[in-house]
């Protein structure tokens, strides 16, 4: 499938070919950048999201993330909408939970199953332009925004209209298609046999790293919008740090410090991603690059930084135990690269019901630090260096972006799963309308059954408590389909090491019943029991729980 560059191609050529003075974008409408990293874990940064810095924070260099944390708000309890990519991405574009849209697995995945369960019917083609959902880029475009997609899309399936972000409301698409990872590798894959899945990157040179290429294109797109004095929404969707892991040439030498090769590669990819963030910040702060920031649009640009799901843990990461790492700082770090350890203190990682699979880094900041420079800042006065501990969910991004843009939410109230975070960011009263929910009725990869939580599940967080309903993996008694429930107090047990289901059965049953009622409300797809070819029977209200 060949993708056009944009609906604005002629205008962009004009902007390049005729020298004009760069002027700030319309101050009445703030620019919004969603900087979305792929598979980045809560600990994969030098910014500490735990109560205290950990050894993981010392293993990575992300200075531009630290810049955002210093100038904006850090969310320590931010959650992806799902433990794998496409569902979270669709949630952020629609404001609806993946259970409601039925985009509840990664687009392109076949029928996933473990020994006793298989996938229910789901929206396997992903987001489509003729679907029932209002799309964020479409809504913003109708209200005067230029909408720009850069990098990984993975919204719609191969060969479908939704594979092209332009059909979903983006004016410009650079690099986005049906692919869920860096097909063809990280070094100029747009010049090889996969060139068609990297639309409009063909003018980038041979040998260029993919992260760098999409960054250059993002900076160009920002430049065009500034020249045209047009407010913009940019979905800056990194391919990093998705597998296959490969070193970023500009940064790998800085990680030859005793860590395993795959971990050195991973760290270099993170630093390259952070450098991408830095390039975008610099473009906003000094658009024409002359050192004079009088033309800055940073004060009128909001950046939301986050990840689409929890970090890789067992999948492709090193599993060799403790290693002494001596980074350039000179400090010796005892790093533990054991199985299921890479997101600690969070349990497990991508694909899992546990915190390591869904808790993600999140920063929100104005790119510039002159709060009185533009009127819109008065309605969203983010306190520099603030920490927000309220649990938030990526279902919230849609409503938040519209609120920041001053655009009415077109989704009927009963169909909204997220809510605006503007009051929370502004230090005003914020009350969560409903618990946070996750639903994954599929098997991410292979028949695991080893306590990683990588199996079909539904989960809910309400206040400090999190309940998980596992549909069954047959491990407990070897006789087949065998559902179970787990309960955790995250305020006391962030690592989810102490299942409270047996000691607090009343609370567990109440929360489980609320979760099951919500599944019915949104008509969530339920895993199919292989031997009966029927959906798994959900527990009746008040029924007893099985505890391991």
Region spans (language model):
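Bacterial N-terminal signal peptides
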Residues: 9-19
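Long, internal low-complexity/basic segments
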Residues: 27-30, 37, 42, 74, ...
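Loop/turn elements at helix/coil->beta-strand transitions in domains of secreted/extracellular proteins
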Residues: 28-33, 71-76, 142-148, 168-171, ...
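Beta-strand elements within well-structured catalytic alpha/beta cores of enzymes
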Residues: 30-43, 64, 68, 92, ...
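Short, structured active-site-proximal loop/turn typified by the sulfatase FGly-forming signature C/S-X-P-X-R
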Residues: 52-89, 95-100, 146-147, 168-177, ...
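Formylglycine-dependent
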Residues: 103-146, 153-267, 368, 374-378, ...
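Histidine-centered active-site microenvironments of extracellular/periplasmic hydrolases
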Residues: 161-169, 244-247, 285-381
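C-terminal cap/loop subdomain of S1 sulfatases and analogous C-terminal strand-loop tails that border
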Residues: 172, 324-355, 365, 369-375, ...
